[in-house]
Amino acid sequence: MAEPGIDKLFGMVDSKYRLTVVVAKRAQQLLRHRFKNTVLEPEERPKMRTLEGLYDDPNAVTWAMKELLTGRLFFGENLVPEDRLQKEMERLYPTEEEA
């Protein structure tokens, strides 16, 4: 089933390929830092219903797509180089191996 807002996401990029790359890279960042670096507010986070109740959805791709829909993420040219951004994110959100 397609995610809600997929048409809006396609309208934000020049190709399906770019959307795939942007979402995949953001999902990797979210997983690497255990979702601590999300731009979503708690009430905006994707939810998953289980027998025990409602929990944050563990699917990083869903989170990345939802983040992109908020307009709080930027992608494209003339941004901070990826290696510099990665160092800053590691400083702010250390992974378990680094902590």
Curated annotation (Swiss-Prot):
Record-linked InterPro entries: DNA-dir_RNA_pol_omega, Pol_omega/Rpo6/RPB6, RPB6/omega-like_sf
GO-annotated molecular function: DNA binding; DNA-directed RNA polymerase activity
Assigned EC number: 2.7.7.6
Gene3D superfamilies linked: 3.90.940.10
Catalytic activity: RNA(n) + a ribonucleoside 5'-triphosphate = RNA(n+1) + diphosphate
GO cellular component: DNA-directed RNA polymerase complex
Enzyme category, top tier: transferase
SUPFAM superfamilies: RPB6/omega subunit-like (SSF63562)
Keywords on record: DNA-directed RNA polymerase, Nucleotidyltransferase, Transcription, Transferase
Presence of the UniProt keyword Transcription in the record: yes
Biological process (GO), any one: DNA-templated transcription
Family (UniProt): Belongs to the RNA polymerase subunit omega family.
Complex and partners: The RNAP catalytic core consists of 2 alpha, 1 beta, 1 beta' and 1 omega subunit. When a sigma factor is associated with the core the holoenzyme is formed, which can initiate transcription.
HAMAP family cross-referenced by the UniProt entry: RNApol_bact_RpoZ
Function: Promotes RNA polymerase assembly. Latches the N- and C-terminal regions of the beta' subunit thereby facilitating its interaction with the beta and alpha subunits.
Protein name: DNA-directed RNA polymerase subunit omega
Organism of provenance: Thermus aquaticus
Gene that this polypeptide is encoded by: rpoZ
